[in-house]
Amino acid sequence: MENFKKEKVSLWRRIAALALAAALALGLAACDASAVVPGSSTPTVSTAQPAGDGQTANFEMHFLDVGQALSVLVECDGQYMLYDGGNVDDGSYVVSYLQNLGVEELQYVFCSHAHEDHVGGLSAALAYFPADHVYSPVTEASTKCFQDFVKYTQQQGLQVEVPAAGTVWPLGSATVTMLGPVAQYDNTNDTSIVLRVDYGSTSFLLTGDMESDAERDLVNSGANLKADVLQVGHHGSSTSTSYIFLNAVLPEMGIISCGVNNKYGHPHEETLSILRDAGVDVYRTDLLGAIVIGSDGQNYTIRTEKTATDAELNPTDPAASSTAQQGYIGNVNSKKFHLPTCPNLPA
């Protein structure tokens, strides 16, 4: 699994690009290619081995390579949460991936919404792994894949639960907060369960296929949407990731789960352009395979199954370089970036 990270774009530039009323002041650190970023956690490139080889990490978020679908596993202190399971045909891969990590049971299983590319593989996961709680925005749907999801939940002696916005769950020493949906929608994508995951000073936002109407309502709800890492909604479709929403999240990194040469053209150029304007680093499963983000509560690391150039990840980026192999190391307390070779790094 490869490790890479490109230079971070200053938070004030991202805010200005999104036309905020005021710019934030930005200082400079005393190290080559360093900067001060207010209120931001910053990544470090890890040389660690891939997950699933016996390593122990305090917190990891895995974006599985399920093609034109979504499946995210969150691990903290030996507890696990599965958010979506890809398509039905992805079920065996999801189970194998979790087995290789040593997963024996799941504390929480979330179906973000009732479309097959999110709920389909959860039946296989529930057939193999015992779960404590299973959640979905609905308890009934007409599709066989959703009915199977309900069946395998009930075979464990559980019922599919419909959680409410504002619910908070512990996951080890991390917290998971349900932010949305905050209204009723006819559009199934907008019913997606939106979760904020906090571990120390690092934060992550899972949005399923939420589109612009639900994004607007979520912003207007006053929920705390600021996050370091954003799962870009609806596989990078132009129907999601509106300016108003991205303005509220201001992520350092956007993860897009989509299939190679998929028929929908995801991610759409409109979405890539918005992310580019905001200075968000884009990571895509169609180019990078599985993506693993680790956190020690202050810094986060990125590991990818494959490598790709910046120009491939966000292809119209005029400033894209050949490859992004060197990273920046940062600390949310000092708010400073350092090159890995910087002599001013703490021991």
Predicted regions and their residues:
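Sec-dependent N-terminal signal peptides of Gram-positive bacterial secreted proteins and lipoproteins
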Residues: L11-S34
